[in-house]
From Swiss-Prot:
Homotrimer; is stabilized by cisplatin via interactions between cisplatin and the methionine-rich clusters, and could be crucial for the copper(2+) reduction process and copper(1+) stabilization. Heterotrimer between SLC31A1, CCS and SOD1; this heterotrimer is copper(1+)-mediated and its maintenance is regulated through SOD1 activation. Interacts with KDR; this interaction is induced upon VEGFA stimulation leading to SLC31A1 and KDR subsequent co-internalization to early endosomes, thereby activating KDR downstream signaling in endothelial cells. It catalyses: Ag(+)(out) = Ag(+)(in); Cu(+)(out) = Cu(+)(in). GO terms for molecular function: copper ion binding; copper ion transmembrane transporter activity; identical protein binding; silver ion transmembrane transporter activity; xenobiotic transmembrane transporter activity. It comes from Sus scrofa (Pig). It is found in: Cell membrane; Early endosome membrane; Recycling endosome membrane; Apical cell membrane. This is High affinity copper uptake protein 1.
Amino acid sequence: MDHSAHMGMSTHMGMSDMNHSTTMPPSHHHPTSSGSHESMMMPMTFYFGFKKVEVLFAGLVINTAGEMAGAFVAVFLLAMFYEGLKIAREGLLRKSQVSIRYNSMPVPGPNGTILMETHKTVGQQMLSFPHLLQTVLHIIQVVISYFLMLIFMTYNGYLCIAVAAGAGTGYFLFSWKKAVVVDITEHCH
């Protein structure tokens, strides 16, 4: 299916016909575009630029190298925070599940002996503060993950690098504390 008429491009346009020195995202406007936001299409290839880069919201547009540097740092820190939040949630979950109590009680045994019987009590409730906190943190984590995905989907190379580098740095800084849990019921070690 030929879509070249939709984008005002010739099917004979080759790599030598493209302007590689631009700092703007690839133009994907319809030929009859009046510059309205509805007629703009998302870039479908990676590009390295800092002019007219729209990030998350219509009013949040990067137009200078300084703004791109600031956006890079902000996205990098957001990706780091996301990784830290994942590890922090695991730690909170582990702490909230430590509320397991063992109760021992004497019971009569054979030949008149007394044995100690131990019962395990797990105290988890749906309407508890730890569960509500986990729910709020989960919502925050989901929103941040979608923001990072949408930032990556701008196809701006600088912002994509910021997401990947921030996530990698966050994992490096926070995941070493991650507990290694071995499932004793797993038979494929």
